[in-house]
């Protein structure tokens, strides 16, 4: 497939990389100011994809062949507070925005454990709100050439990166908004929900304590499934005993598609592997897919949140 590359200079590429963040457009800042959150919009909240070294092109080509979209020109840069080097690019697809990292050096701890990068309308306020919400700051705020970053951890060990840049990007709205997929134990669920909902300004959309275990490869069993909505996008929390078959729990994001069968066919033709499914549940079908470079994603059709 011919890749649609956006011809950006290195500074512009860095602006796009969610691991080092971007500033909010003025219209988005105005909107965010009206709510009790520092969110800007789901298209600025990017899934972090750390590929197997040398597999960045294969991953991006496969993703774009499956979902469509564009990508920025690759940049070789340091995106951590301690010395490191990664080749990085941003993928803008209709189903979600991804920051892709192909590290040339070992990845400094705890980078690689964060699931997403959240653009803050106000960085300092975002860090304060994270602390006030009960999250730990696991990477203290640090400057990069064009902005600021920090990594926070919510109860249950869920990491996310907060970022902000002085120069604002402008991305088109997504066709479908992806879900953050979180796996927790009963011991951590209450504390996580309290902290996460306070930080995101979110709400509980549904809380099914007897959800179909078939959704997680456990037919005949049940689990607790909590769907959350917020200005950052959707989140699906699966509360289980941790007895999960592979690859459940390895995915961090779920992507909504209009035709799951057709999408899986495209993915396989583009070099991806269907690891599980599709499974038809209550009003939705889902499958687990691994793309070149090792990235595992949940794909679903129908009601999710």
What does each model-identified segment do?
Residues 143, 163-169, 299-305:
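Short beta->alpha transition motifs characteristic of CBS
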Residues 235, 252-260, 265-268, 273-280, ...:
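C-terminal functional regions that serve as terminal interaction/effector modules
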Residues 38-41, 48-96, 140-154, 182-233, ...:
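Core segments of cupin and vicinal oxygen chelate
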Residues 2-28:
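Secretory targeting and sorting signals
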Residues 29-43:
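N-terminal low-complexity, Pro/Thr/Ser-rich intrinsically disordered segments
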Residues 74-78, 82-87, 99-127, 131-149, ...:
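A cross-kingdom feature marking solvent-exposed beta-strand/loop segments within repeated
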